[in-house]
Amino acid sequence: MSQERSRLFRSAKTRLSLLLGLLMFTFGFLKVVNPTIDGWFHVQIQQSHLPHSAILMGKIAEIMTGILFLLPRLRLWSAKWEGRILLIACSSLFLVMLVAVYVHLQPGVPPEVLPLGIKPPVIPLFVLLLDAMVAVPAWKDIQSEGLPIS
């Protein structure tokens, strides 16, 4: 791969990870401080027949995922650690979005409590695509550095 193309992918990975970090942290934080959004989230979880503990776990997962995406941007890390942190963030976001897709597909969840009132899981699937666009270059960076994952 050419140097210019590699730099372009690295730049896109950096911007997307920053965007995903800000989005996840913001929405997780809003679920904690905004009663309206928190109410919607409660309805989503309850109508999906997920356990009550999923409410707190979902909020924590969104905030922590956001922090993990932002962490490499807040401090300089070696390439080894930056790649590992981003892959953990991508894995966490993957799980959160799988739950979001599940919630969207539940017939008992009304569209009014979903983001933008959209019942099909368009938003979680789009976020999964963005997640893959960060994970693949992060994985390739680790592999090209010859750095073991374990």
Spans of features found by a protein language model:
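Membrane-interface extramembranous regions
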Residues: 2-150
